[in-house]
Amino acid sequence: MEWTDEGIVLGVRRHGESSAIVELLTRGHGRHLGLVRGGAGSKLRPLLQPGNSVSAVWRARLDEHLGYYVLEGTRMRAAMLLASSHAVYGVTHLASLARLLPERDPQPEIYERLERTLDDFDDVGEAAVHVIRFELTMLAELGFGLDLANCAATGVTSDLIYVSPKSGGAVSRAAGEPWRDKLLRLPPFLREGSAQRNDWSDQDLQDGFLLTGRFLLRNVLEPRGQGHSDARDGFINAVVRLRTRELAETAPPK
């Protein structure tokens, strides 16, 4: 058995004296593990960092075997990602989410979303938007997608600003007003047709994390006996800290 694919490094663990088991999210073969000979050595260490993109050749005698990887770097992001606290936390959090996917099940939309997210970590606010959208996509792939296209109460498709915490359906301003204190807020960047960069406020980011965090916890993590990772909390805190600093630096002098 042999195949060649694109992949993103999710994690690595030592195996024996010199080898390592590498976990990739691949474009065409899903989340897939393989043994890399010499993977525990210093020569391959820079390549096998989470967030790097690689060209992967996988070989095994039988399809169900662990198999061996031969990897070549195609986009070495790790050095840039390790240079900022929000990116370090973000990559760790994204990898932990990707591990919720079943092994060897192709998830091309998740792969492309992860790739776009990793390529845009230099902008703190946009990185936060990407992570929230990644969480939303993960919910859909795991069978718990939110219905944000129309109002769950009336069916209208405009002025959707709330989400029901029970059903996960969008709610319009008019229909939700009597229960506004019990509804979650739907940030503009998650509404249909919103794709502009920097089309968000810091409150929008907080609303987005609260929204996806609630449904991830209730529908995905708690049934597995898990909670939100420390990396997710660290990422959110780093974003808040860096955004506060950015706003202070750009504020006009008093």
Swiss-Prot record:
Gene it is expressed from: recO
Write down what this protein is called: DNA repair protein RecO
A GO BP term here is: double-strand break repair
One Pfam entry for this protein is RecO_N
Q: Does the keyword DNA repair apply?
A: yes
Q: Which UniProt keywords apply?
A: DNA damage, DNA recombination, DNA repair
Question: Which InterPro entries does this chain map to?
Answer: ARFGAP/RecO, DNA_rep/recomb_RecO_N, NA-bd_OB-fold, RecO, RecO_C
The text of the family note is:
Belongs to the RecO family.
One GO cellular component term: bacterial nucleoid
- Keyword Transmembrane: yes or no? no
Stated role: Involved in DNA repair and RecF pathway recombination.
> What organism does the UniProt record list as the source?
Rhodopseudomonas palustris (strain BisB18)
